[in-house]
Amino acid sequence: MSSVVRSGRISVPALRARKGGTPIVALTAYTAPMAGHLDPHVDVLLVGDSLGMVIYGFETTLPVTLEMMIAHAAAVVRGSSRACVVVDLPWGTYRESPEQAYRNAARLLAETGAGAVKLEGGQEMAETIAFLTARGIPVCGHVGLMPQDTLMEGGYRATGRTEDSAARVLADAMAVAEAGAFMIVLEGTLEPVAAGMTRSVAVPIIGIGASPHCDGQVLVTDDMLGLYGSFQPRFVKRYAELALTVAEAAACYAEDVRTRRFPAMEHCYTLSR
């Protein structure tokens, strides 16, 4: 059964129209409670396949399944009412053919009520993006550093370090935009290259490890809140240290239980007088 999309959400055309205007604010969300906390403050809630690492403890995003993405995206839609919900198509669900991509994207949107899908890839994915958009599937592109290519690349490496690399990233973004993507995430790309791309490409460029001159920014929420491990990518600014708060709260709770300070009588049910 599909989720119901509530009225009042930021639309795909509204996001596309933000090119060169007030920067678009995006954060990841994987659960209904977090979506509810973030929704008043952001324009886009990205249900990223990063949930494989953040929620499930995988080393990469590659083990994430379509069923996982559907379950989490539906929760985010239920927990929010304002932001546009964009959902990653996971590895292995869209590169075989445009028809495979359409089948899985249509299922994802129908079963979750999300507003758009996101897929990784440049010039080689232009045909697929055009196929999807021609059939009513809004697509957000993703170029530059592409986490789903980690097997081919041997890890995570910033792009745009050479003239050839910079030209390739720009050509990828241009191809994705011309194919019909309404917005493009640009990840892990040298700042001058990212700034120039933002000026050159007709649709909003959302940076993550890119440039302050992009049309918007996205971060993994757990990174931004200091919840996800000790490793901090260079491009992350921590706005809180919630891992410490959680640890302190758990320690206080454990001490109260062991010393029988919790539960106190006010936490117990008693007969009314």
UniProtKB/Swiss-Prot annotation:
<protein>
    <recommendedName>
        <fullName>3-methyl-2-oxobutanoate hydroxymethyltransferase</fullName>
        <ecNumber>2.1.2.11</ecNumber>
    </recommendedName>
</protein>
<dbReference type="GO" id="GO:0000287">
    <property type="term" value="F:magnesium ion binding"/>
</dbReference>
<keyword id="KW-0808">Transferase</keyword>
<feature type="binding site">
    <location>
        <position position="120"/>
    </location>
    <ligand>
        <name>Mg(2+)</name>
    </ligand>
</feature>
<dbReference type="Pfam" id="PF02548">
    <property type="entry name" value="Pantoate_transf"/>
</dbReference>
<dbReference type="GO" id="GO:0003864">
    <property type="term" value="F:3-methyl-2-oxobutanoate hydroxymethyltransferase activity"/>
</dbReference>
<comment type="subunit">
    <text>Homodecamer; pentamer of dimers.</text>
</comment>
<keyword id="KW-0963">Cytoplasm</keyword>
<comment type="function">
    <text>Catalyzes the reversible reaction in which hydroxymethyl group from 5,10-methylenetetrahydrofolate is transferred onto alpha-ketoisovalerate to form ketopantoate.</text>
</comment>
<feature type="binding site">
    <location>
        <position position="118"/>
    </location>
    <ligand>
        <name>3-methyl-2-oxobutanoate</name>
    </ligand>
</feature>
<feature type="active site" description="Proton acceptor">
    <location>
        <position position="187"/>
    </location>
</feature>
<dbReference type="GO" id="GO:0015940">
    <property type="term" value="P:pantothenate biosynthetic process"/>
</dbReference>
<feature type="binding site">
    <location>
        <begin position="49"/>
        <end position="50"/>
    </location>
    <ligand>
        <name>3-methyl-2-oxobutanoate</name>
    </ligand>
</feature>
<dbReference type="InterPro" id="IPR003700">
    <property type="entry name" value="Pantoate_hydroxy_MeTrfase"/>
</dbReference>
<dbReference type="InterPro" id="IPR015813">
    <property type="entry name" value="Pyrv/PenolPyrv_kinase-like_dom"/>
</dbReference>
<keyword id="KW-0479">Metal-binding</keyword>
<comment type="pathway">
    <text>Cofactor biosynthesis; (R)-pantothenate biosynthesis; (R)-pantoate from 3-methyl-2-oxobutanoate: step 1/2.</text>
</comment>
<comment type="similarity">
    <text>Belongs to the PanB family.</text>
</comment>
<feature type="binding site">
    <location>
        <position position="49"/>
    </location>
    <ligand>
        <name>Mg(2+)</name>
    </ligand>
</feature>
<dbReference type="InterPro" id="IPR040442">
    <property type="entry name" value="Pyrv_kinase-like_dom_sf"/>
</dbReference>
<keyword id="KW-0460">Magnesium</keyword>
<feature type="binding site">
    <location>
        <position position="88"/>
    </location>
    <ligand>
        <name>Mg(2+)</name>
    </ligand>
</feature>
<dbReference type="GO" id="GO:0005737">
    <property type="term" value="C:cytoplasm"/>
</dbReference>
<feature type="binding site">
    <location>
        <position position="88"/>
    </location>
    <ligand>
        <name>3-methyl-2-oxobutanoate</name>
    </ligand>
</feature>
<keyword id="KW-0566">Pantothenate biosynthesis</keyword>
